Amino acid sequence: MFILLYHILHICVYFFNIAPKGNVFHNRLDRKKTWLKGKCNKDKEGWKARPHQESVMKFKRKLKALCKRSWSIDLTYRIKKINEVTRGWINYFRIGSMKNKLHKIDEHLRTMIRVIIWKQWKIAKKREWGLLKLGVEKWIAHKVANWGNHYQLVATKSVVARAISKEILTKRGLISISDYYQKVAHI
């Protein structure tokens, strides 16, 4: 934690030229090698740090790799791995201000999980059975089940988005990224 605060102080000094007296940032290594990228913003509550865009993109790439449709593993194991990556990343960057970014990532992650579930159901009969089990009316389930393999369209624009809701995924074990961040960051 001290190292992260040290780097945030270093970032604020670099951006805002607020250097304390003495050589606080003396380091045997080159500063370019030890630079932690990020930004500091001032809002009504004071100075806030946020993770650099590269760090956010790396987090998204990790989640995308875990949500590949071609990786045929059990959904429980996949959710376990996603939760590990999510907890680790949020615990590392928890003092940062990133509520809106994490909300968007959370929505997209749930869409990717819906696509995976839709693909795992494979045939129309199984898809209809799954939708009926989730409480969708029979005629709607029959129509949506026969849409074909338009995974992203089905996961975002159909009844699947409401049937496989955030609550259903939470029961299955997936932690909400934005909820976990708010819990850990004490916002």
Task: Name what the model sees in each region.
Residues 1-187:
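Non-catalytic terminal/accessory segments
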